[in-house]
């Protein structure tokens, strides 16, 4: 297995994309430190990791809190002795109907705290161990296609994800001498509970019509890319943003000119 006995710390792994990444890496042989806001959500993923014959550690923590992040990393080191892979997946989207004038200071700060500060805090804490061990490492950040395109009512979320892109590139340059690969994945429209809850069916359908592939992706589509980036097969890849979006960012065809004959796939069973 490509990740046999590797140790991965994955934030926001209790559901959705984070859970899919954890299961994919577990299937590839890794042992997983499963972080989420609450132990209850993380435990569901941990049990599935253990069913794969791998070890799992549940660590509830808010990645927006630097002290909690330091404790999370230390707990992982205490349990497994090292961290080979960090996946900064935890994120938050707060709907802001009304645009920039409607978003509150609290919502703005929360989005930046989780989506940007969280990956920074986690990377800073993990990198100390990676550098000290002199064995390299892998950091994978989860950004979004919304780092590249703008639309209404996302004046906090989109800047936060764009900042993750530059954080990825900066860390890749800084950490290359230590053979620490830093890359990001930018999901497009993914069939997950989180997306359904935050956007609603009408908005999701509108996005689907914009996708050249004709369908939303599944959470496991992100999981497989993350597992590849965490493997030695991706050893010379660093500072890159891999968009997994069914061609969304490449297409400028007006929606009115698109064929609507694509079949609609069922909801992703792995996102539950």
Indicate where each model-derived feature is located.
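C-terminal substrate-recognition "lid" of short-chain dehydrogenase/reductases
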Residues: 2, 80, 181, 216-244, ...
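Short C-terminal tail/terminal secondary-structure segment
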Residues: 97, 238-272
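Substrate-binding pocket helix/loop in short-chain dehydrogenase/reductase
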Residues: 97-100, 104-112, 207
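Active-site helix of classical SDR
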Residues: 123, 160, 168
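Residue(s) in the substrate-gating loop at a strand-loop-helix junction
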Residues: 144
């Amino acid at each position: 297995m490509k990740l046999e006995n590797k140790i991965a710390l994955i934030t926001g792994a209790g559901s959705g994309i984070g859970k899919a990444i954890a299961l994919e890496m577990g299937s590839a042989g890794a042992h997983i430190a499963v972080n989420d806001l609450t132990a209850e959500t993380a435990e569901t993923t941990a049990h599935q990791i253990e069913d794969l014959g791998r070890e799992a550690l549940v660590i509830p923590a808010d990645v927006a809190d630097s002290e909690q992040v330091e404790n999370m990393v230390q707990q992982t080191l205490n349990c497994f002795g090292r961290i080979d892979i960090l996946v900064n997946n935890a994120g938050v989207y707060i709907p802001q109907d009304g645009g920039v004038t409607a978003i509150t200071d609290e919502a703005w700060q929360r989005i930046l705290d989780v989506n940007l500060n969280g990956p920074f805090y986690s990377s800073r804490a993990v990198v100390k161990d990676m550098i000290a061990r002199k064995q390299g490492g892998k950091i994978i950040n989860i950004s979004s296609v919304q780092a590249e395109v703008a639309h209404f009512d996302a004046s906090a979320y989109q800047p936060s994800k764009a900042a993750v892109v530059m954080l990825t590139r900066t860390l890749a340059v800084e950490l290359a001498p230590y053979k620490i690969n830093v890359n990001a994945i930018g999901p497009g429209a993914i069939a997950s509970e989180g997306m359904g809850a935050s956007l609603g069916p009408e908005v999701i359908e509108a996005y689907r019509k914009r996708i050249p592939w004709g369908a939303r992706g599944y959470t496991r589509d992100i999981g497989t890319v993350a597992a590849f980036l965490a493997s030695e097969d991706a050893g010379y890849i660093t500072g890159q943003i891999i968009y997994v979006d069914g061609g969304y960012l490449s297409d400028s065809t007006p929606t009115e000119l698109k064929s609507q004959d694509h079949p609609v796939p069922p909801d992703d069973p792995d996102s539950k």
